[in-house]
Amino acid sequence: MNTKSKHLVFLTGAGMSVESGFKTFRGADGLWENYPVAQVATHEGWEANPTLVTEFYNMLRQKLFDAQPNEGHRLIAQLEERFRVTVITQNVDNLHECAGSSEVVHLHGELSKVCSSRDPYNPHFIRQLTATDAVITPGTKAEDGSLLRPFIVFFGEAVPMMDAAMALTAQADLFGVIGTSLNVYPAAGLINFVPRGVPIIIIDPEPISTTVNGGITQIQKGASEGMKELVETLLPRLFHNN
């Protein structure tokens, strides 16, 4: 059997990156790095104070460039030696790419990029940043004359990569969920697009609650330990010819 004939699709969330020391999620108190989410992660917040928003993401971006992929990221990337692997991530970091994953769909944008505030998804106005130019001076303009804004899907904005994510999920031979509680929509709805009979593996140290019936196996561990169990124990059992 051609080992690349099987398609593994992973949906990853904040718990995937926490072992790398990078936190890109809001707490139960509605704060993100001590800032109210409404101020730094909404279109209204951007319109009201683009300087604050630019400086907030400068801070996060500098933390990102100090972070390193963890064993969980690396194990997912290594599976590409034997399978087609797609990562659909709710995270705005680029740690999957740093670990070597080649097919990554970012649902909520990418912290390492900035874009036009007038035409955010025009590729001509999207700029990739590096550790040496991670800080954007507030007021810097894109090539179309609008302010550069973080290439982030703010709360309340449409998720443009969702259709692609649904189509990829519908092709899965295995669907893995790592580090997300499945209560962030629309991403949480992806589990409903998994073909009938396809195994669903959820890696999360907390007990899961999902309305999908049957076919779900939980590995109640963190991302790295859970991925190790998936690779060493579950995958050989599920795809023994691979």
Locations of regions flagged by a protein language model:
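Conserved catalytic core of sirtuin-type NAD+-dependent deacylases
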Residues: 1-242
